[in-house]
Structure formats: C-alpha cells, structure tokens
C-alpha cells in the first residue's frame, strides 16, 4: 500500500512484493530480474509462516540455479532472528523488531525496510515523522479535537450502535488504491473478535466489514447500491487538496465527483418516480490530505492505527491478538500433510469429502 502510494518518490530501485503462496505471485515478481542484481528481504515475525518460508525457499533455489552465493542475496526482517540465522541468513543481514509488534501495525518497524529501499531513507524518515506527529496529536489534543478518537467514535457508532455491518473506504486518489485492502487487515484482524478481552460474552457487534475501491471507478460499480440499496453502508472518502500530477482539470473533476457523491449520499433527491427517488441520510465522512507525500501518509496510517485501537477499547476487545489467523495456520498444516500423504486426515471432519475429491482429481503438469 505505502509503496504504491509513494510511487512518485521511488529512488530508482525496482521493489516488488510477494505475499501469496500461489506460485504465480513469485513467478510474476521474478520475471525479467537478474539473480546477480536481486536482493530478497524475507519479512516474517516468526520466520515460520508456511507461505513466506515456501516462497523464500523458491527464491533461494532461483538464486542457486544461477550459481550465486545465495547468502549474499538475502536479508531478513523478523522478531525471531535466531530462526533467520538458522535458515542461513547471516546475522549481520538480519534486522530484528520486537515480538509484540503485530504485522498490521509494523509499517514503521524494520518490516518497512523494502519501503525504505523504494523511497529512500530521507522519505522514510519523513513518513516516520508524520506518524510521530500524529502520535503527539493523540497524546495532547482534547477528545473533541482528537482526530483518531473522533474517527473511532464515528466508526463505532455506525458499526455497533446503528448496527451498520460494513463500511466502504473509497480513496479519490488512485495512488491510494490499496488503502481499502490495508484497512481490511488493520481493522478486521484487530477488532473482528467474538468475545471480550477478558473472555466474556459481548453484548454487541464488533468490527465492520471493510471494503472499497478508488473513485471514480467505484461510482460505476457499487455506488448504485450505496445510494438506493436496502442496506445502508457508511462511506469514507479519502483524497488530497493538491493534485499528484500536472493535470489540474482532471484533479478538479476528481474532487467534484467526490463532493457530489458525499452530497448525494447525505441529502438524497426527491422525485415523483420511485425508481429515481433517493432517501439520503446515508452516513459518510471525508478525509482530506493537503497532499500525498511521505509525511501525510505516515500521519494517515497512524491515525487509522490509533482509531483502530480506540475502537477496540470501545468494543471491549483485544485489538492485538489474532487467534483466527493462528487457527487457519494450524489447520493448513493438517491439510498440507494430508495432501503430501495422499490421504484425507480424520481431523478434517467437515472437509473430508472435499479433500478426498481433490486428492482424486489433482494433477500436476510435468
């Protein structure tokens, strides 16, 4: 997300990210690259995540196939440096962060090393300063003028008190096109919990479903539902005052569309024809940055991080665990072992027929 948002400030290095265990992801990232001029940064908190380590093994094999000392082409960002060294990465090329830093809150840690490579040290420090400025604002501002607190209250009221189960994040800035996906993990992994932080029952709902696409594209996809659908969906618009390029007319049209959508959602429109009637009263918020740069992006990310934590506190959940993710990892190990053995595991009580079907039909191209 951040590398995409700050692509106009890239230093000249080609930086590609691989997160999916689907082989197509790594294949696409390696396309056109020279092993002698490629550095891999393996980013893993535990250095045991199956997807990450499988991709790392494949990347290492790719370097070895070129007859190169692979250890000179790898670095690690991890909270478990011992595991990285045991895997073969030299200690001096292993960058450690605290084990209490969750992945979704780790952009400002050494996990941000690839971003630093992309935009340069100075720009990365500007992003960190933007985060620190937002941190200082949170600590010093009164609740009534505290941006993360006000933002958290807005999302909490919509999701919990008004019981509106989703929120659409629509950046009217194409370089922020990955912001909705970033917030999906930040918000839903943090606050998508079914019990209180003490293990007790919750008397209310928790995290909304976060989704979205950049404007104006979304206007021609899901905005019809936002305006006239039976399910009310809060919308969060994010944009910038200053354009990113030289086309001022295009930027003015972009902002005009955003403001028009905010007005239409809030005010609606009357008509004798019920098909053309808009009820309005559809909640929406607008976040405007002066410009999209490293400092403002850092402040924006920190604002969302603080807001997420405040929402979790209001909901009474622990925003800093993710046992649902851990369950998926453990079940994936059982499924992977079953595929390796060619026999469905008895522990797969609900998906036993599916595993048997897959094992019967699976084929690999030679």
Feature locations, PLM:
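Glycine-rich oxoanion-binding loops at beta->alpha junctions
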Residues: 2-39
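C-terminal helical/tail subdomains of lipid-metabolizing enzymes
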Residues: 285-342, 348-365
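Short beta->alpha connector loops at strand-helix junctions that form conserved
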Residues: 18-19, 44, 95-100
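Non-catalytic terminal/interface segments that mediate subunit docking, oligomerization
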Residues: 1, 5-14, 195, 229-236
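Short glycine-rich or small-residue beta-strand-to-loop segments that form or flank ligand, phosphate
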Residues: 40-46, 166-173, 209, 287-290
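Acidic, Ser/Thr-rich peripheral helices and adjacent loops at domain boundaries
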Residues: 244-276
């Amino acid at each position: 997300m951040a590398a995409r948002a700050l692509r106009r400030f890239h230093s000249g290095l080609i930086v590609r990210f691989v997160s999916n265990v689907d082989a197509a992801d790594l294949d696409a990232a390696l396309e056109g690259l020279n092993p002698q001029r490629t550095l891999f940064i393996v980013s893993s908190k535990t250095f045991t995540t199956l997807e990450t380590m499988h991709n790392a093994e494949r990347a290492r094999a790719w370097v070895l196939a070129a007859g190169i000392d692979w250890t000179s082409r790898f670095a690690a960002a991890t909270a478990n440096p011992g595991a990285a060294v045991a895997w073969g990465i030299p200690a001096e090329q292993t960058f450690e962060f605290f084990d209490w830093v969750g992945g979704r809150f780790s952009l400002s840690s050494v996990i941000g090393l690839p971003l630093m490579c992309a935009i340069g040290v100075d720009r990365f420090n500007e992003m960190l300063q933007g985060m620190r400025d937002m941190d200082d604002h949170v600590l010093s501002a009164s609740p009534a003028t505290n941006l993360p607190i006000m933002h958290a209250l807005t999302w909490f009221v919509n999701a919990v008190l008004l019981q509106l189960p989703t929120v659409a994040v629509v950046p009217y800035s194409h370089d922020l096109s990955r912001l909705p996906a970033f917030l999906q993990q930040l918000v839903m992994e943090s606050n998508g919990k079914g019990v209180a932080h003490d293990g007790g029952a919750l008397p209310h709902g928790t995290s909304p479903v976060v989704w979205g696409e950049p404007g104006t594209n979304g206007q021609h996809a899901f905005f019809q539902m936002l305006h006239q659908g039976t399910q009310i969906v809060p919308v969060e618009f994010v944009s910038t005052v200053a354009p990113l390029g030289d086309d001022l007319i295009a930027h003015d049209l972009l902002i005009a569309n955003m403001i028009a959508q905010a007005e239409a959602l809030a005010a609606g429109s009357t008509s004798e024809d019920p098909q053309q009637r808009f009820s309005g009263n559809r909640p929406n918020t607008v976040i405007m940055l002066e410009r999209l740069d490293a400092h403002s992006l850092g402040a924006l990310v920190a604002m969302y991080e603080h807001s997420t934590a405040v929402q979790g506190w209001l909901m009474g959940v622990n925003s800093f665990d993710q046992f649902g993710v851990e369950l998926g990892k453990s079940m994936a190990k059982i499924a992977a072992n079953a595929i390796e053995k060619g026999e469905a595991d008895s522990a797969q009580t609900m998906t036993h027929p599916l595993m048997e079907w897959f094992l019967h039909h699976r084929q690999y191209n030679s």
